[in-house]
């Protein structure tokens, strides 16, 4: 099937922002203007097109990234609407991994907010070119220039206005386009009719000044253009647009526009900017892939290269079952074809191919390079897997890295009969979300769920009830502590039983070393066949199993390097099980030799409070072992306090903050890092945990 849109006409973009900045409403307006929907749904009414899960419509927040395809002025725009709540940053992360450009939505009153910083950092990691849309210009306290300035000061990013507002707050009427040097006034109707007017007299000097700033800012990205500017030559419209595009594609220059999506002002101009300045798949560096152990290869964005795609999201659809979202980096993909999962080394069949619009869909026969599609029928593919043409040279795209869960809860179904349904439901939810884990506590037999925050787990439990018909009782949230080692030691592990009948013989020497931030690393240095090859994997597995249950207080162990360097075997009595047990015994024995310590999750907390309550809240954070990182007074008179605080001290904080600030304070929290627990606190936790484990025995 012939390609319907040239690759240079594609725009794969994400809409990202802090919670409540108006992302979903903005996406709704884009869909309205591009002809995708005919009736507007409002987030605050629970009727938004992109927020299609029941929980999203009830809570008025976006949880999963809904994908949709729209068309504007001959361009094909694939849009991902991402959540702004910190418990769902995995959705932002995996979207940015497969997008080419993004629109960052700011609230005109607040400018850059805590979660804006998080998503901006994520986008910077993937070098995603961005356009800034300052929304809610009609809101009390709205200030376009202060919002743009906050991008420069808070994000250290070169944001430059390409529009200025005509009026603000309730007087916001339209915009002056600094590229065209024309003014537009909006009628506020859903069609967003714009009337060209004279640039208001009181804005003419400011418009000239800001246009000159824009020209000088983009001139630094092109020497020839800069020489013209220095010679006083006025750029043509096409020249200036080309220069803004060139600067934006560097991911170092960020054009800023403004509007109010809810009041239908400025969105069409923002879509024009998406088309004019954000990249096509041909404008960004080719995707990198690994071939074999050490070779890195480029995957060119073309239909002529063998099919290469990344599975960036898996979700369960009530009508078609499992849907796997794929970004095609190269080649073509047909429904009914076989592909190779090079991450897992398995073959998969593409049953059907679907173009998604929030939760409605249309089937297609073929997808091309640059497309974002959903495939039905994949059995073993999970988030982050590379899919390639069946007989193509084997390559693997760079994997996505997801944070470890920091909070857990015990879960049990209200009836024993529902155990099987519960296990199946949890398995499906874990396949969709890489930051959600579920396992059975071997000591208690309880089902444990673990995730990125209380809201994350609330929604998991809610989805179990709605989608899988399982009502469950939930225990109190628990901190997910970790254990690690701080010293190196050579440790012997033996499992030898040789009295009568077939015996058991496993004998290892393992060097344990700290491995900060690198997870578990196993190195085989056995030479001369001292331990036969077939027992090496069981030794590694024995260590991994023991690490999962810990050696200090029953918490999982992280960041350890284990080097197997010596040992012995018995011709008759050695077995996989014996070596597994020997390795486990070595790690248990190492407890006092390697300086085993307890680690606690430290959270990045941003608290927004009126000035009157600053002292009380600051004192409370200090009492919670919080370390203040930054304090800033915003334009609206509120303070933002950023601090690093142990998760164990933050349970119930929402209620405490409400009571301290008469309901006027709010906060956001996300995992930052694991840190050694202070000895007095660690001793108390270990003591309680060991009593608990003893009682359960």
Swiss-Prot record:
Keyword Protein biosynthesis: yes
Binding site for GTP: 17-24, 81-85, 135-138
Primary residence: cytoplasm
Database matches in SMART domains: EFG_C, EFG_IV
Protein's cellular compartments: Cytoplasm
Family, as annotated: Belongs to the TRAFAC class translation factor GTPase superfamily. Classic translation factor GTPase family. EF-G/EF-2 subfamily.
Function per UniProt: Catalyzes the GTP-dependent ribosomal translocation step during translation elongation. During this step, the ribosome changes from the pre-translocational (PRE) to the post-translocational (POST) state as the newly formed A-site-bound peptidyl-tRNA and P-site-bound deacylated tRNA move to the P and E sites, respectively. Catalyzes the coordinated movement of the two tRNA molecules, the mRNA and conformational changes in the ribosome.
Name of this chain's protein: Elongation factor G
Biological source species: Mycoplasmopsis agalactiae (strain NCTC 10123 / CIP 59.7 / PG2) (Mycoplasma agalactiae)
Gene from which the chain derives: fusA
């Amino acid at each position: 099937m012939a390609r319907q849109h040239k690759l240079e006409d594609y725009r794969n973009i994400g809409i990202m922002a802090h919670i409540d900045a108006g992302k979903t409403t903005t996406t709704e307006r884009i869909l309205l203007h591009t002809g995708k929907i005919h009736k507007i749904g409002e987030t605050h009414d629970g009727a938004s097109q992109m927020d299609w899960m029941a929980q999203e419509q009830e809570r008025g927040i976006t949880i999963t990234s809904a994908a949709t395809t729209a068309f504007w002025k001959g361009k094909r725009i694939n849009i991902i609407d991402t959540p702004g709540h910190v418990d769902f940053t995995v959705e932002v992360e995996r979207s940015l991994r497969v997008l080419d450009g993004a629109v960052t939505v700011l609230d005109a009153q607040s400018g850059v907010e805590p979660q804006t910083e998080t998503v901006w950092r994520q986008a910077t990691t993937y070098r995603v070119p961005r356009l800034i849309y300052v929304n809610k210009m009609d809101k009390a306290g709205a200030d376009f220039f202060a919002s743009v300035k906050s991008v420069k000061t808070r994000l250290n990013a070169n944001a430059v206005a390409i529009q200025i507002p005509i009026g603000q707050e309730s007087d916001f009427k339209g915009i002056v386009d600094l590229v065209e040097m024309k003014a537009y006034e909006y009628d506020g109707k859903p069609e967003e009719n714009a009337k060209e007017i004279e640039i208001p007299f009181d804005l003419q000097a400011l418009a000239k000044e800001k246009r000159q700033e824009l020209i000088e800012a983009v001139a630094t990205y092109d020497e020839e253009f800069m020489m013209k500017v220095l010679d006083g030559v006025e750029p043509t419209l096409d020249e200036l647009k080309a220069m803004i595009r060139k600067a934006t594609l560097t991911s170092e220059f960020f054009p800023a526009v403004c509007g109010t999506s809810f009041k239908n002002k400025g969105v069409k101009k923002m879509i024009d900017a998406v088309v004019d300045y954000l990249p096509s798949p041909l404008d960004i560096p080719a995707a990198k892939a690994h071939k074999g152990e050490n070779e890195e290869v480029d995957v060119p964005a073309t239909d002529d290269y063998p099919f290469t795609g990344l599975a960036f999201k898996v979700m369960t659809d009530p009508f078609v079952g499992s849907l796997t979202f794929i970004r095609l980096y190269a080649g073509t993909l047909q429904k009914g074809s076989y592909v190779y999962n090079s991450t897992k080394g398995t073959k998969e069949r593409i049953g059907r191919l679907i173009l998604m619009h929030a939760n409605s869909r249309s089937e297609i026969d073929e997808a091309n390079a640059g497309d974002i599609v959903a495939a039905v029928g994949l059995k073993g593919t999970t988030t982050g897997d590379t899919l390639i043409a069946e007989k193509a040279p084997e390559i693997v795209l760079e994997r996505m890295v997801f944070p470890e869960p920091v909070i857990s809860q015990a879960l049990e179904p209200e009836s024993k009969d529902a155990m099987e349904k519960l296990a199946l439901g949890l398995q499906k939810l874990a396949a969709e979300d890489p930051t959600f884990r579920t396992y059975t506590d071997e000591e208690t037999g309880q089902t444990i769920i673990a995730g990125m925050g209380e809201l994350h787990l609330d929604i998991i439990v809610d989805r179990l009830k709605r989608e899988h018909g399982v009502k469950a009782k939930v225990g109190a949230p628990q901190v997910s502590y970790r254990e690690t080692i701080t010293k190196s030691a050579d440790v012997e592990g033996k499992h030898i039983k040789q009295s009568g009948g077939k015996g058991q013989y496993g004998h290892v020497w393992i060097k344990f070393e700290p491995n900060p931030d690198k997870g578990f690393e196993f190195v085989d240095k056995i030479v001369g066949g001292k331990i036969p090859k077939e027992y090496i994997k069981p030794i590694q597995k024995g260590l991994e199993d023991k690490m999962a249950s810990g050696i200090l207080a029953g918490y999982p162990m992280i960041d350890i390097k284990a080097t197997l360097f010596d040992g012995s075997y018995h011709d008759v009595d050695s077995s996989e099980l014996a070596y597994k047990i020997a390795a486990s015994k070595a790690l248990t024995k190492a407890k006092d030799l390697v300086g085993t310590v307890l680690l606690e999750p430290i959270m990045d907390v941003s608290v927004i409070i009126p000035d009157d309550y600053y002292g009380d809240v600051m004192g409370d954070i200090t009492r919670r072992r919080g370390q203040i990182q930054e304090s800033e007074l915003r334009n609206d008179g509120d303070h933002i306090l950023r601090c690093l605080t142990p998760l164990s001290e933050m349970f119930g904080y929402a209620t405490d903050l409400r009571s301290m600030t008469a309901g006027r304070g709010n906060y956001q929290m996300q995992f930052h890092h694991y840190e050694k627990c202070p000895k007095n606190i660690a001793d108390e936790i270990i003591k309680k945990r060991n009593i608990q484990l003893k009682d359960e025995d």
